[in-house]
Each structure stands twice: as structure tokens, then as C-alpha cells.
Amino acid sequence: MSYTLDISCEIGRKNRPAVIICPGGGYEFVSERESEPVALRFAAMGIHAFVLNYSVIQKPFPTALLELAQATAFVRANAESWDIDPQKISVCGFSAGGHLAASLGVHWDKKFIRDTLEFKDEHKPNSMILSYPVITSGKYKHEGSIQNIVGLQPKPTPLDLVSLENHVSSNTPRTFIWHCCDDNVVPVENTILFIQALSKNKISFECSIYPHGGHGISLCDDTTSSKPSQYNEKCSQWFINAVKWLKSPDK
């Protein structure tokens, strides 16, 4: 699904940023609460938005990753006609969708992607926005997400490949990431492991860790809240902070 802004004769061409949104759902389904409402909010801020309905259960790694790589390359290939800055194409993921977005961030330069898709670097995201992401297949893993992406009896290689903190490199794009301390679904240690790896590799990042909020709170307001616990005014600041960060010069 795409939520692109029309080129206006009054405004003129703007060469706007774009985000490709990967909703969460534990690699079992694609969350509606982290799809269209988020895309519309980005569009309201002058950012083109796309939602990727990626393959989930019974479609093991790297199926969804290859789909995101193709989507990123497709958006970049159409950047001129859609009034998109080809150097400002970001991936934005929530929970398991955060794992998918971060997977492209750390694996975009790997041989298995380039050889399969015959890409050079047109699929590289320029930055990542990660919301309460699944990151590790180790001690702090989200069991359901990892099982759905690699199976119940995974081979060592794919199990290592989906533990993303081990694959951050100097080629990983800059990152905005946030999480809640009291997340009892995807432990906050997932984010901590990732920012430690980013710091070790000298990758620019901005991180917010909120004391309360739990998991799966999306925009944290009436737009996406299905129950009172998903409304959190303090955590809702993540979005405006992410937009400011996204529009700031790369560092």
C-alpha cells in the first residue's frame, strides 16, 4: 500500500523523504494498528509512506527480507516520478517488523541477497526507524517471532543470521530506535543489544527508552489504541522525535 503525496503546482517538486513501513505481528500476521495509521501520520508530515504486507508464517527466512529489499529498490527506481529523494529512503519497523527492517539494515550488503536479486546497492535503506524491535535469537529472544521465521528445528546458520546484533557493521545505516522498560513481550534488552552493536561500529543512532508502556503501542494515542494501556502520552513523543531525526542531516 502506498501513501504518496501528489506533486502540487503550487508547492512544486520537493524531493521528499520516504519510509517503507513493516508492521509487527510476530511473523504470524501483519498488524493493522501499525500499518495505515502510521503511514497516514508520516504523509501528514510531508513524508511519502509505503506499507509492506510481507510474507509471514510458513515462509521462512529470508523470504520477507528479500521482499523488503525488492520494495526498497522499487521505491528508489521510481524516486524521480514519485518526487522522492533517492538518498532518503528509510525502513520503519515495529516488533517483528522491526526485526525485518533491521535485517535489511545489517544484511543488505550480504552476498546471499545480492546474488539472489542481482542487486548492487539499490536496495540499501538510508536509515532505520525501529519500534520495540525483535533483534536477537539468543537469551532475550521473542520465541514466537524466531520460531516463525526459522522453524521449530532451525539450522545453525539461519539462527545466527536472525540474531541481528551480531551482524551490525560499518555499512549499517543510521538508526532511530525506541522501546519500553516494562515490555514483557519483547524484552528491552533487544534494543540494548542493538545499540551496543551500533556504538561499537560507530554508527549514528538516537535511542529513547521509556519507563512504562509495554509492547505494541504503535502511535500510542487514540488513532491506534484498542485498549487504555496502549494510550501513552509520553511514549507518543517517539513519532515527532523520529520525524525530526529523519529530516535532520545525516551524520
Task: For each feature predicted by the language model, list its residue ranges.
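Short amphipathic alpha-helix adjacent to the substrate-entry channel of hydrolases
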Residues: 32-50
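Conserved alpha/beta-hydrolase "acid-adjacent" motif
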Residues: 184-193
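Catalytic nucleophile-loop/oxyanion-hole region of alpha/beta-hydrolase
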Residues: 30-32, 52-86, 232-234
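Active-site nucleophile elbow and catalytic-triad environment of alpha/beta-hydrolase enzymes
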Residues: 3, 118, 152-167, 172-173
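Short beta-strand/loop motif that positions the catalytic acidic residue
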Residues: 171, 177-179, 183
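C-terminal catalytic histidine-bearing segment of alpha/beta-hydrolase fold enzymes
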Residues: 192-251
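Primarily recognizes the serine-hydrolase "nucleophile elbow" in alpha/beta-hydrolase
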Residues: 70-143, 155, 159
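Short beta-strand element of the alpha/beta-hydrolase
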Residues: 15-24
